[in-house]
UniProtKB/Swiss-Prot annotation:
Transit peptide, residue positions per record: 1-27
Compartment(s) where it occurs, according to its Swiss-Prot or TrEMBL record: Mitochondrion
Binding site residues for S-adenosyl-L-methionine: 38, 63, 85-86, 111-112, 141
InterPro entries: KsgA/Erm, rRNA_Ade_diMease-like_C, rRNA_Ade_Mease_Trfase_CS, rRNA_Ade_methylase_Trfase_N, rRNA_adenine_dimethylase, SAM-dependent_MTases_sf
Top EC group: transferase
Similarity section: Belongs to the class I-like SAM-binding methyltransferase superfamily. rRNA adenine N(6)-methyltransferase family. KsgA subfamily.
Keyword field: DNA-binding, Methyltransferase, Mitochondrion, RNA-binding, rRNA processing, S-adenosyl-L-methionine, Transcription, Transcription regulation, Transferase, Transit peptide
Family matches, as SUPFAM superfamilies: S-adenosyl-L-methionine-dependent methyltransferases
Primary subcellular site in the record, as a coarse category: mitochondrion
Protein name according to UniProt: Dimethyladenosine transferase 1, mitochondrial
Catalysed reaction equations from the record: adenosine(N)/adenosine(N+1) in rRNA + 4 S-adenosyl-L-methionine = N(6)-dimethyladenosine(N)/N(6)-dimethyladenosine(N+1) in rRNA + 4 S-adenosyl-L-homocysteine + 4 H(+)
UniProt-listed CDD domains: AdoMet_MTases
Length: 343
């Protein structure tokens, strides 16, 4: 672990404020990239503090923008900070920070959705999964447009222990729209409980740490922002392939106002739907009249375990997609109507 019980002694030299840099570079937030800048360094410092002790740690910051959180990370006396920024307009401002912190800041122009962070840091940082988390952290003020696909991608990486998690149980401290943050951390039975809740919590200890009011950002978003901390679990609560778990969970939550059996039926072709759904629920010992927000992680584990056995018995079952079946049926009906019209 990074050294503890020791105050950071390294600090950035005096620099223009983030607001001054934005004016200097004549940069405006790009709406198409869902950009919102956090200029208050008291808040960026708080995000970094909540990430844990970063002294001598290696940090991967996603979407640094004008560099507010970047400054706070550097002031935490990290060993190295890697930033990946898609928008080239921010590179000069980040380069100014790099010049002020020689050897500490590495800037990559790229897309966080495709960047291979598993090759970014030294092999010596890797730790066995069962050990304490490595001295590698992910921190970021995520653009709203990429936050959900990115966390799903990283959750799959956790399941496979690849990507940023080749180093071990890499911790993440990330921002989301408040509503998404609440869903990620929602307890069983709460109104916020969702697909994201289950997918995140079967793999991680998830904490919604604090909320930042929208007025703290420039431009001000229409929503508040939640800061969420993730620590991957040593043992996932569901030990099945990620895609299988995702399919079961998605089906349960696709009809939020119905009983859970309504969504689970869509796992099976129409000809065997009722029988197979009944068998799945009976073997998993799950009440078919639970609402989607009510099943616990252990319920989902049972459903996934039984569904896996059913897929093993019928190798074509996992590939089944009820929307494709509907599409084919609609196409056949249209062809029949055309034939009838011709006759």
């Amino acid at each position: 672990m990074a050294a503890s019980g020791k105050l950071s002694t390294w600090r950035l030299p005096p620099l223009p404020t983030i607001r001054e840099i934005i004016k200097l570079l004549r940069v405006q937030a790009a709406k198409q990239l869902s950009q919102n800048f956090l200029l208050d360094l008291r808040l960026t410092d708080k995000i970094v503090r909540k990430a844990g002790n970063l002294t001598n740690a290696y940090v991967y910051e996603v979407g640094p923008g004008p560099g507010g959180i970047t400054r706070s990370i550097l002031n935490a006396d990290v060993a190295e900070l890697l930033v990946v920024e898609k928008d080239t307009r921010f590179v000069p401002g980040l380069q100014m920070l790099s010049d002020a912190a020689p050897g500490k800041l590495r800037i990559v122009h790229g897309d966080v959705l495709t960047f291979k962070v598993e090759k970014a840091f030294s092999e010596s940082l890797k730790r066995p999964w069962e050990d304490d988390p490595p001295d590698v952290h992910i921190i970021g003020n995520l653009p709203f447009s990429v936050s959900t696909p990115l966390i799903i991608k990283w959750l799959e990486n956790i399941s496979c222990r690849d990507g940023p998690f080749v180093y071990g149980r890499t911790q993440m401290t990330l921002t989301f729209q408040k509503e998404v943050a609440e869903r990620l951390a929602a307890n069983t039975g709460s109104k916020q409980r969702s697909r994201l809740s289950v997918m995140a919590q079967y793999l991680c200890n998830v904490r919604h740490i604090f909320t930042i009011p929208g007025r703290a950002f420039v431009p001000k978003p229409e929503v508040d922002v939640g800061v969420v901390h993730f620590t991957p679990l040593i043992q996932p609560k569901i030990e099945q392939p990620f895609k299988l778990v995702e399919k079961v969970v998605q089906n349960v939550f696709q009809f939020r106002r119905k009983y859970c059996h309504r969504g689970l039926r869509m796992l099976f072709p129409e000809a065997q739907r009722l029988e197979s759904t009944g068998r799945l629920l009976e073997l998993a010992d799950v009440d078919p009249t639970l609402r989607p927000c009510q099943p616990s992680i252990s319920h989902f584990k049972s459903l996934c375990d039984v569904y896996r056995k059913m897929c093993d018995e019928d190798p074509q079952l996992f590939a089944y997609n009820f929307r494709e079946e509907l599409k084919q049926r609609k196409s056949k009906n249209e062809e029949k109507e055309e034939d009838d019209a011709e006759n």
